Amino acid sequence: MSESENKIRVLVVDDDVDQLMLLERTLNAYGFEVRTHRSSLGVSNLVRNAIPDLVLLDVNIPALSGDKVLALARNQAPATTRFILYSASDESKLRSLALSSGADGYISKSVQGEALARKLISIYKKSKLPAASAR
């Protein structure tokens, strides 16, 4: 198995270019394989073609909000792909939105570096559980 086959594949969707660059550098440094996308449009196709393990979705993105993108993209994604809402907004609001939209997790944008990597790995490992215990 090659090194890239062992990496957790993450698709990061955010309209903030600086945020995308920061996340890409950070997650690459922690051994993730990262792909970025600057728009809520086209995410379903990316998910279908790139088959990421995790999709980190900015909630406040123009055109379609993160929870709406999640609803559309989940239909194109393999059952093992996990969707995580990502936002700088109040954590209780983010938690509520994640629960109501069926996200597999949520992460505040204040979580960075090693803490972010640990949270993503934790959500990824939960995706390995049988579907019946995932909810």
Language-model segments: what does each one mean?
Residues 36-54:
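Acidic, metal-coordinating helix/loop segments flanking the phosphotransfer/catalytic sites
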Residues 68, 90-107, 111, 115-118:
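Alpha4 helix (beta4-alpha4-beta5 surface) of REC/receiver domains from two-component response regulators
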Residues 38-39, 65-68:
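Acidic catalytic/metal-coordinating carboxylates
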Residues 1-11, 114-135:
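Non-catalytic signal-transmission and effector/linker regions of two-component phosphorelay proteins
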Residues 17-35:
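Two-component/phosphorelay signaling modules centered on CheY-like receiver
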Residues 20, 62, 91:
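The feature encodes the CheY-like receiver
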